[in-house]
Amino acid sequence: AYTPTQIIPLRMGLAYLTLWALRPKTMKLPWKDELMFILIGITGGSFYFFLQNTAAAHTSAANVSILVSMSPILTVILAQLFSRKGEKLGKLVYIGAVVAIAGVVLVVLNGTLSFHLSPMGDLLALAAALMWAVYSILVKRYTERYDNFLVTRRVFLWAFLTSLPLVLLTDGLPSLTPLFTQPNILISWLFLGVFGNAVCFAIWNIAFKRLGVVVTNNYLYASPFVTVVVGWLLLDEKISWMSILGAVLITLGVIFANKSTEK
């Protein structure tokens, strides 16, 4: 009923309304901060998902998964270049990143040994990874200054608003009729908007504040393996020896990287 691009404003809008209903408190911001929140909404919301979805149309799902999983190492680089306070990082964080990325590759390939380059799609996926890295650095800065709940809500507001031009220029605004006439679509929408966005982003932003962006984003390396496990549990998909080895490498990589950031 909906294209991937049309789903973006639907889930972002629902996430914003959910958080607003839970705390209908006005958040007044200086105009400079408001501009930064627009950028945060773009990098962590509208453009991040748009680039990822568009990449999937031009390259394989394996390529997208592997390249988007590069966001933690890009976060490390940006944290060193632009973070005001700076997170102390040692050599182990880079070793851990290499080990974890190797694990991600094994998990995503899952025994197929098939990886084909597709320049346009691959660059879009890498751009999505960069978007998330920028979002991570910026949102941590503002969760230290403002209430995390209100920050997350503001991010979704701008993610929703900036996704509208993308939809208008591509697939057109989505009709709301299927949401109320097809129960399976309604359930999927509620899951994506309430849990996938509102709840998960709020928790993730808390982790940014408490653990730092580098440590928190290191756990993104585990995402492909979690996907494989869920596929095994719910869809009866097979897990190969490559996936198991990949999971071990991901775990070791995260341990190495997090050890490096311990103060």
Language model features by range: what are they?
Residues 9-10, 45, 49, 64-70, ...:
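Helix-helix packing/entry segments at the starts of transmembrane helices
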Residues 20-68, 102, 106, 193-211:
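Specific transmembrane alpha-helical segments of multi-pass solute transporters/efflux pumps
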Residues 14, 43-44, 51, 74, ...:
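Hydrophobic residues within membrane-embedded alpha-helical segments of Major Facilitator Superfamily
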Residues 1, 58, 86, 145, ...:
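Helix-loop interface residues and adjacent transmembrane-helix termini in multi-pass membrane transporters
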Residues 4-21, 39, 93-102, 120-127, ...:
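Hydrophobic alpha-helical transmembrane segments of multi-pass integral membrane proteins
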Residues 6-17, 44, 53-87, 91, ...:
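Specific alpha-helical transmembrane segments that line the substrate/conduction pathway
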Residues 1, 57, 107-120, 170-184, ...:
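Membrane-interface helix termini and inter-helical loops of multi-pass transporters
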Residues 19, 38, 77-78, 89-110, ...:
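Hydrophobic transmembrane alpha-helices of multi-pass small-molecule transport proteins
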